Amino acid sequence: MAQREWVEKDFYKELGVSSDASPEEIKRAYRKLARDLHPDANPDNPAAGERFKAVSEAHNVLSDPAKRKEYDETRRLFAGGGFGGRRFDTGGFGGFNVGGDGAEFNLNDLFDAAGRSGGTNIGDLFGGLFGRASGGRPSRPRRGNDLETETQLDFVEAAKGVAMPLRLTSPAPCTNCHGSGARPGTSPKVCPTCNGSGVISRNQGAFGFSEPCTDCRGSGSIIEHPCDECKGTGVTTRTRTINVRIPPGVEDGQRIRLPGQGEAGLRGAPSGDLYVTVHVRPHKVFGRDGDDLTVTVPVSFTELALGSTISVPTLDGKVGVRVPKGTADGRILRVRGRGVPKRSGGHGDLLVTVKVAVPPNLDGAAQEALEAYAAAERASGFDPRAGWAGNR
């Protein structure tokens, strides 16, 4: 759901992109800013840390299609300070406060604006804006934002899987109050004004409305003695190291979701998720084709013509691969079950491409042998270009 603060924030400006920017443009802008503003790169610059958090929040909203749609609709509804040119006080939805022209707010303006914005559900929109569900149901603590990070793996690590530490600087549960927001030895109390629901009811003429409780700010609880470390939020920004298990067979560019490892929610609310984008370094010998492992092996002409068994590397050591007599240069030989581990179990195959290596120099014996072979080849009538389209 949208947040009340969205009305006053320009996430597009925060990332330096236009409001019609593509997802790829948003991702590129975020990566550049996050790299420049990351706390690890600016240890003595608190302003960079605050900007980093603002950029992360903007990316969290604009990178999620559902959140971006709701954000755009929210901004359209409140464009110009209100509906139909009248100012609307977002701090008092139940009161229908209007601006300096003294004009009376008409409910029809609200629903007309909703229709123009593409069918926005007013209950859902305002329920999200004011931190509660539509219909006046008790509010729930807001889940923390999702986080994104990147890591690089060697080819073999990506193929076989690996456990690795990942260092993050992000909002995390306060270690002093364990995320409750209350000073150690105390605990939050149920708000007596709203009885823990987070909303209070008001009447406006013939209509009844619910709005966030002003005493607990919609949380349903009151902290009389806030934690000294987090000032009652339950969250502090710190650097932490988590152990990540990268599953076997991960591919370059793939995203891995780690539930509950994202930004901490306020006052003990659930944490968001962490998405890790994996980048795989190329290997000097191996390649990949899905779950199949590919390798090109140099061979001699005689090994192809006469047949042989060659030694081929795999992820688990070398194996012998039989080259049938008369194998053509560039042929692919398949070795089943020697490829990359599959998510569904088992392994892909090893695809071996044989490539003739021509000797740059020949000694006398080799020269004579090849000349004798060439003469025998001509005598047999063999023409390597017979049937070739270039001869037509």
Curated annotation (Swiss-Prot):
InterPro entries: DnaJ, DnaJ_C, DnaJ_domain, DnaJ_domain_CS, HSP40/DnaJ_pept-bd, HSP_DnaJ_Cys-rich_dom, HSP_DnaJ_Cys-rich_dom_sf, J_dom_sf
Domain J: 10-75
UniProt KW keywords: Chaperone, Cytoplasm, DNA replication, Metal-binding, Repeat, Stress response, Zinc, Zinc-finger
Co-factor binding details: Binds 2 Zn(2+) ions per monomer.
Cofactor: Zn(2+)
Zinc finger extent (CR-type): 161-239
Binding positions for Zn(2+) 1 per the UniProt entry: 174, 177, 227, 230
Keyword Phosphoprotein: no
Superkingdom per UniProt: Bacteria
CXXCXGXG motif repeat copies, ranges: 174-181, 191-198, 213-220, 227-234
Signal sequence, start to end: none
CDD domains documented for this protein: DnaJ, DnaJ_C, DnaJ_zf
Residues that, per the record, bind Zn(2+) 2: 191, 194, 213, 216
Pfam family for this entry, one: DnaJ
Subcellular location: Cytoplasm
GO biological process: chaperone cofactor-dependent protein refolding; DNA replication; protein refolding; response to heat
Molecular function terms, GO-annotated: ATP binding; heat shock protein binding; unfolded protein binding; zinc ion binding
GO CC, any one term: cytoplasm
HAMAP family for the chain: DnaJ
Task of the protein: Participates actively in the response to hyperosmotic and heat shock by preventing the aggregation of stress-denatured proteins and by disaggregating proteins, also in an autonomous, DnaK-independent fashion. Unfolded proteins bind initially to DnaJ; upon interaction with the DnaJ-bound protein, DnaK hydrolyzes its bound ATP, resulting in the formation of a stable complex. GrpE releases ADP from DnaK; ATP binding to DnaK triggers the release of the substrate protein, thus completing the reaction cycle.
Family: Belongs to the DnaJ family.
Domains as described in the record: The J domain is necessary and sufficient to stimulate DnaK ATPase activity. Zinc center 1 plays an important role in the autonomous, DnaK-independent chaperone activity of DnaJ. Zinc center 2 is essential for interaction with DnaK and for DnaJ activity.
Subunit (UniProt): Homodimer.
Protein name: Chaperone protein DnaJ 2
Lineage of producing organism: Bacteria, Bacillati, Actinomycetota, Actinomycetes, Mycobacteriales
Gene name of the record: dnaJ2
